From Swiss-Prot:
GO biological process, one term: ribosomal large subunit assembly
Record SUPFAM superfamilies: Ribosomal protein L20
Keywords from the UniProt entry: Ribonucleoprotein, Ribosomal protein, RNA-binding, rRNA-binding
InterPro entries the UniProt entry points to: Ribosomal_bL20 (IPR005813), RIBOSOMAL_L20_CS (IPR049946), Ribosomal_protein_bL20_C (IPR035566)
Subunit structure: Part of the 50S ribosomal subunit. Contacts L21.
Tagged with keyword Ribonucleoprotein: yes
Single GO MF descriptor: structural constituent of ribosome
Protein name, as recorded: Large ribosomal subunit protein bL20
Record GO cellular component, one term: cytosol
Species in which this protein is naturally found: Escherichia coli (strain K12)
Family membership: Belongs to the bacterial ribosomal protein bL20 family.
Function, as annotated: One of the primary rRNA binding proteins, it binds close to the 5'-end of the 23S rRNA. It is important during the early stages of 50S assembly.
Gene name per UniProt: rplT
Keyword Ribonucleoprotein assigned: yes
Pfam families the UniProt entry points to: Ribosomal_L20
């Protein structure tokens, strides 16, 4: 059996990790051992935050809708309930956009929700 020298493989693996760690602070971008830990941790954060992003955007949309709804004299929960009763199927993302960029249309939706509740 011929001897297998693994220097080339190790070099490639190290280069790959150091390339991923490019831009990190201090030893995290230069020392393989530290860079490897940093890259693993970054991956864990990325995995976690891809899930959190969905929650955070929903929270943001709800906060925006609530603020706009209260300017029109109705709470968020009553507004959403009114829209459901009026069978208006617009999701929170679009409602938040309407609340920010088209106040007239949002006011019309609020009136529709209030009418459905009454």
């Amino acid at each position: 059996m011929a001897r297998v020298k693994r220097g080339v493989i190790a070099r490639a693996r190290h280069k790959k990790i150091l390339k991923q760690a490019k831009g990190y602070y201090g030893a995290r971008s230069r020392v393989y051992r530290v860079a490897f830990q940093a890259v693993i941790k970054a991956g864990q954060y990325a995995y976690r935050d891809r899930r959190q992003r969905k929650r955070q955007f929903r929270q943001l949309w709800i906060a925006r809708i609530n603020a706009a709804a209260r300017q029109n004299g109705i709470s968020y929960s009553k507004f959403i309930n009114g829209l459901k009763k009026a069978s208006v199927e617009i999701d929170r993302k679009i409602l938040a956009d309407i609340a920010v960029f088209d106040k007239v249309a949002f006011t019309a939706l609020v009136e529709k929700a209030k009418a459905a509740l009454a």
